[in-house]
């Protein structure tokens, strides 16, 4: 824990610890929420397409609202915005917890809350990306991003998801109350930061501000390619993961509580990759690291779909994918934070997030269809093939990666 909290390159040790702690605590609640939501849906239906709909509705806001969220984030104070949005998310999830306890609502209520929480998350995500470069110097971005990623994987998958699944097996509303508490504490910590990324006064119409971010990213061949690759990767990832709860329960025959343990074990690679990311990127460079992940991840996904018939094989292969994802995230996020002008960070980040996350609901819906047509293993194979094709197509543009990054 001490190593995680050590300031990467000092601007404010206190602010770094507050920001890291806020992310770590909210990730714990997110994990409980993400484990409990599909389990809650599975008590209402066993239809793969309806189960996948939970993920689709939760990620649809990225397709609809990412660009306006980025423009708004650049206008608003990042610290105040993030803390306010987290309070709103606590209120929304608290409402779902009450419905669960009263045994009212149904799959449509789950969809509605997933959508509303996802809508708030678009603004929270962009505001959070604006805060880190204020707290950490550019030379420490890889280390800071790696430590934030490590906290996210460890708390969301190792702790949050098993906790959420276990609490759901005890009382269905409990994991949602854990998420409410995590958002409240995180909002308080963010509000306590002494530094922030202030809003940029701009009298232009919101549409013009959005267009400025789009033009900047479109004119940068490397970041444009990486954003498109992230979109394809997330489409494929959600195609595979949308029916994962059914894949694990039907193929491995595990209980609800054991499902959370399986999900936690798949995050081993993510935590390890986050700890090692700064060292690996520093040793081999961002370009070589990203190119390696582009081919390792889809290969592991295809093998998982074909041969994962036991927990050991499944978690080993899934850990390879999460290890690669951590390296990718740290290398690409650090490059973006180092390259994009501060006054455009929210808008450019939101365009990248639109391309990366806007494909998630499409992938989730396709995952439900593919699983319904060809079985629960098919989404992993299809997703791996899609990512391999994208990797081959991106080889030439990635030669533009700067040697200093």
Task: Briefly describe each language-model feature range.
Residues 1-405:
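Alpha-helical transmembrane-bundle signature of multi-pass membrane transport and export proteins
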């Amino acid at each position: 824990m001490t190593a995680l909290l050590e300031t990467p390159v000092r601007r404010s040790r206190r602010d770094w610890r507050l920001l890291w702690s806020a992310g770590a605590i909210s990730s714990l609640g997110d994990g409980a929420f993400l484990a409990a939501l599909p389990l809650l849906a599975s008590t209402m239906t066993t239809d793969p397409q309806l189960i996948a709909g939970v993920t689709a509705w939760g990620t649809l806001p990225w397709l609809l609202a990412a660009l306006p969220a980025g423009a708004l984030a650049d206008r608003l104070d990042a610290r105040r915005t993030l803390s306010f949005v987290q309070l709103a998310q606590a209120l929304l999830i608290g409402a779902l917890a009450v419905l669960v306890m009263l045994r009212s609502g149904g799959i449509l209520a789950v969809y509605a809350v997933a959508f509303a929480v996802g809508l708030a998350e678009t603004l929270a995500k962009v505001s959070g990306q604006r805060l880190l470069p204020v707290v950490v110097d550019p030379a420490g971005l890889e280390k800071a991003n790696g430590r934030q990623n490590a906290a996210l994987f460890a708390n969301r998958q190792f702790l949050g998801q098993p906790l959420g699944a276990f609490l759901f097996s005890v009382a269905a509303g409990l994991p949602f109350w854990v998420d409410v508490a995590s958002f409240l504490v995180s909002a308080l910590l963010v509000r306590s930061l002494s530094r922030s990324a202030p809003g940029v006064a701009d009298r232009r119409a919101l549409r013009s501000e959005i267009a400025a971010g789009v033009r900047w990213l479109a004119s940068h061949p490397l970041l444009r390619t990486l954003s498109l690759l992230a979109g394809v990767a997330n489409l494929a990832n959600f195609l595979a993961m949308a029916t994962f709860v059914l894949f694990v329960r039907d193929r491995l025959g595990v209980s609800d509580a054991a499902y959370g343990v399986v999900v936690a074990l798949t995050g081993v690679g993510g935590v390890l990759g986050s700890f090692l990311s700064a060292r690996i990127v520093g040793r081999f460079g961002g370009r070589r690291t990203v190119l390696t992940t582009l081919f390792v991840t889809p290969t592991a996904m295809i093998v998982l779909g074909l041969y994962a018939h036991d927990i050991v094989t499944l978690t080993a292969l899934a850990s390879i994918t999460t290890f690669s994802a951590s390296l990718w995230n740290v290398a690409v996020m650090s490059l973006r934070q180092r390259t994009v002008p501060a006054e455009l960070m929210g808008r450019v980040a939101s365009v990248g997030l639109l391309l990366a996350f806007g494909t998630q609901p499409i992938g989730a819906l396709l995952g439900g269809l593919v699983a319904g047509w060809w079985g629960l293993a098919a989404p992993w194979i299809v997703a791996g093939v899609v990512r391999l094709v994208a990797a081959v197509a991106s080889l030439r543009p990635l030669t533009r990666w700067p040697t200093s990054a």
